[in-house]
C-alpha cells in the first residue's frame, strides 16, 4: 500500500482509541493505559511500515510482529480490525464467551503470530522468526516493565550475536507498570546505553509522533536501499517515549490506568472526551 497521509494515520489512531475504550467497557475490562500508549506505534507499523496483506495473513513473504507486552491486546485487536484482518464489528465480542478475542493475543485471531502475555518471551520469539528468514523484517513490541525480565536480555544478547539485522525491538517507554514507576521497581536507565552495550543500534523517538516513528521504523532505517537487514548485522532498538493512558487526561500518566473495567457511563464519558479531542485536532 502507498504511504498514508498523517491525517489518515491520525484518524485511524483516534478510531483505535475509541475501540480500546469500548472493549474496556466490556464484561472483563481491559488493560487501558498500556494499550492507549501503544496506539501510534502499532498504527504506523501496520499501516505504513510492515509488508502485510490482510487477505493473506499467512503469506510466506509477510513481515512479522510479536507483541511481547501481550496485555496490550486490545490495542492490537483495534489496529488489526482497522487494517482489515477481521470485521470491526467483532470487537464488540471481546472477552465474551466463545469469542476469539481474549485478554491476551492468541493465534486464532488473524494477524496474531504468537500467543503472548507471559512477559519476557516476545523478543526470543521474534529472534526465531528473524533467524528463520532474513529476507523479511521482524518486530518485537515490548513494554518497559517487561524489560525487567532477565529473559529479555538473554534474547537481546542472542539477537546481536546472531547478526539479526532484520530485527527491530520497539520499546513502549511509558515509564509506568502495575505497581508504579518503572524506576521505583527495577530501574532501567540508562536504557539506551544498556541496549547499545548488548550490540544493538538504538534510536529514541516520541512514540506519539507519526513522522518520528516513520523515520525510525521505515525499511530504509534498518537496511541499505530498503532491504530487510542492516549491512552491519546489528538489530535495532527503538525506544518510543509514550504516555500511559494517552488520550484520556483523567488517567494520562497515572498508574491506575493500567487496568480498567469501565461502566457504561464511564465508557460513554471517555468516548465523549476522545471524540472532542478528535474534533479539535481535525479542525482547520
For the regions a language model picked out, list residue spans one by one.
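N-terminal hydrophobic or amphipathic helices/low-complexity stretches enriched
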Residues: 1-16
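N-terminal capping segment at the start of a domain
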Residues: 13-29, 172-174
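Cofactor-binding active-site loop characterized by glycine-rich and histidine/acidic residues
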Residues: 23, 35-161
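Generic beta-sheet signal
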Residues: 63-65, 136-140, 167, 232-242
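Glycine-rich beta-alpha junction loops
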Residues: 71-72, 174-175, 242-245
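Short acidic, glycine/serine/threonine-rich loops at helix termini
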Residues: 77-79, 106, 151-153, 179-183, ...
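Thiamine diphosphate
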Residues: 111, 115-225, 230
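Glycine/aspartate-rich loop-and-adjacent alpha/beta segment that forms the canonical ThDP
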Residues: 210, 216-284
Amino acid at each position: 500500500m502507498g504511504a498514508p497521509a498523517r491525517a489518515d494515520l491520525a484518524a485511524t489512531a483516534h478510531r483505535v482509541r475509541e475501540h480500546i475504550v469500548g472493549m474496556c467497557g466490556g464484561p472483563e475490562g481491559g488493560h487501558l493505559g498500556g494499550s492507549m500508549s501503544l496506539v501510534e506505534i502499532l498504527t504506523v507499523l501496520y499501516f505504513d511500515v510492515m509488508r502485510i496483506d490482510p487477505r493473506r495473513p499467512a503469506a510466506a513473504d509477510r513481515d512479522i510482529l510479536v507483541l511481547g507486552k501481550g496485555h496490550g491486546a486490545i490495542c492490537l485487536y483495534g489496529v488489526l480490525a482497522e487494517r482489515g484482518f477481521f470485521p470491526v464489528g467483532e470487537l464488540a465480542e471481546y472477552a465474551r464467551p466463545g469469542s476469539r478475542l481474549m485478554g491476551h493475543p492468541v493465534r486464532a485471531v488473524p494477524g496474531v503470530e504468537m500467543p503472548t502475555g507471559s512477559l519476557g518471551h516476545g523478543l526470543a520469539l521474534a529472534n526465531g522468526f528473524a533467524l528463520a528468514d532474513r529476507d523479511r523484517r521482524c518486530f518485537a513490541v515490548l513494554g518497559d516493565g517487561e524489560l525487567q525480565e532477565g529473559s529479555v536480555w538473554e534474547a537481546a544478547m542472542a539477537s546481536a550475536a546472531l547478526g539479526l539485522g532484520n530485527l527491530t525491538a520497539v520499546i513502549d517507554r511509558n515509564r509506568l507498570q502495575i505497581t508504579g514507576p518503572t524506576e521505583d521497581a527495577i530501574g532501567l536507565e540508562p536504557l539506551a546505553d544498556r541496549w547499545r552495550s548488548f550490540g544493538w543500534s538504538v534510536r529514541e523517538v516520541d512514540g506519539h509522533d507519526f513522522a518520528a516513528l516513520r523515520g525510525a521504523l521505515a525499511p530504509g532505517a534498518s537496511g541499505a536501499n530498503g532491504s530487510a537487514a542492516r549491512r552491519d548485522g546489528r538489530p535495532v532498538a527503538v525506544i518510543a517515549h509514550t504516555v500511559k493512558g494517552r488520550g484520556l487526561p483523567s488517567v494520562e500518566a497515572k498508574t491506575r490506568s493500567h487496568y480498567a473495567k469501565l461502566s457504561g457511563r464511564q465508557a460513554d464519558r471517555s468516548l465523549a472526551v476522545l471524540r472532542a479531542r478528535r474534533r479539535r485536532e481535525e479542525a482547520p
